[in-house]
Regions:
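Conserved aromatic-histidine-acidic binding/catalytic patches
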Residues: 42, 46, 70, 74, ...
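Hydrophobic (often cysteine-bearing) scaffold residues that line and stabilize catalytic clefts
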Residues: 50, 54, 153-157, 218
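N-terminal signal-anchor transmembrane alpha helix of single-pass membrane proteins
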Residues: 1-25
Length: 261
């Protein structure tokens, strides 16, 4: 009994030592406001009160999660876009801390599944990834993909938001397209049926949802979420039932932006 208690105490102390230290909360000043206003369309549509709340959430994220440039000089814009990508999917919740994330690595370009990049690396076609195994707790993003996701607001494609939605999906322990922490149990079966119906439409070329969403339930949820946050009006018009389900899931309606209570 005492031996087990001793091991538990040692384990907890190791956790405290290894747990990333929270950085001091930075002030949401004019520089950050300007970066978000010029580069994040979602932010521009917010009311003044919501913009301030969004900014505070961005600063909180940057105090909790380390953003590291890998062989590149990380710019404030990169930090702002990473933090905005993290904040957008959970802005409908009063508070949210990503349980499975301690660092975001920003690569200069696309990479492969072995996290290799540069001219000598083969199969460099990955733009973003949630790490697992020895990379658990990490997210990897290509800087080009990160920035392009916010430059083009009409293509229904945002790599960073896509990866943060995967993290939300992982909150229940697995990335499977069924975000149980966001969804009441009663909606599970209707959600799965809707996913399969929509995937069938994608794979039959009868949908404007990106083809990658038809590859698995996991990717469908992330791809549909990109569309939901980038083009909410079009998403609601073309996929009204799915739109309603996503509003319930994310507790917000991007068309109107204000938190849906």
């Amino acid at each position: 009994m005492y031996y087990i208690l001793f091991l538990a105490i040692i384990g907890y102390l190791i956790y405290l030592v290894r747990k990333p230290k929270r950085k001091p909360l930075r002030v949401f000043d004019k520089q950050w406001k300007k970066l978000l206003d010029e580069n994040v369309y979602y932010y521009r549509r917010l009311s003044d009160i919501e913009k301030q709340r969004f900014g505070v959430r961005v600063m909180q994220f940057l105090s909790e999660v380390k953003v590291t440039g890998v062989n590149l000089e990380l710019k404030p814009l990169d930090e702002a876009l990473v933090a905005a990508s993290a904040t957008i999917p959970v802005f409908g919740f009063d508070e949210w801390e990503y349980a499975y994330l301690d660092e975001v690595l920003v690569y200069p370009s696309t990479f492969n599944k072995g996290f290799e990049y540069g001219d000598g690396a083969k199969d460099r076609n990955v733009m973003g990834m949630v790490g697992d195994g020895y990379m658990n707790g990490k997210m990897i993003l290509s800087r080009n993909a990160l920035r392009n996701g916010f430059k083009n607001t009409t293509d229904k494609h945002n790599t960073a938001i896509h990866e943060f939605v995967h993290l939300l999906d992982k909150e229940d322990g697995s990335i499977d397209g069924l975000p149980e922490v966001l969804m009441s149990h009663q909606y599970t079966i209707p959600w799965l049926k809707m996913i399969h119906d929509k995937m069938e439409e994608i794979n039959s070329d009868k949908s404007d949802i990106r083809n990658y969403g038809g590859t698995s339930e996991t990717e469908f949820f992330a791809v549909a979420s990109e569309y939901f946050f980038e083009r909410p009006d079009q998403f609601k018009r073309n996929h009204p039932e799915l739109y309603t389900m996503m509003v319930q899931c994310f507790k917000q309606e991007p068309k109107y932006v204000a938190v849906s209570r």
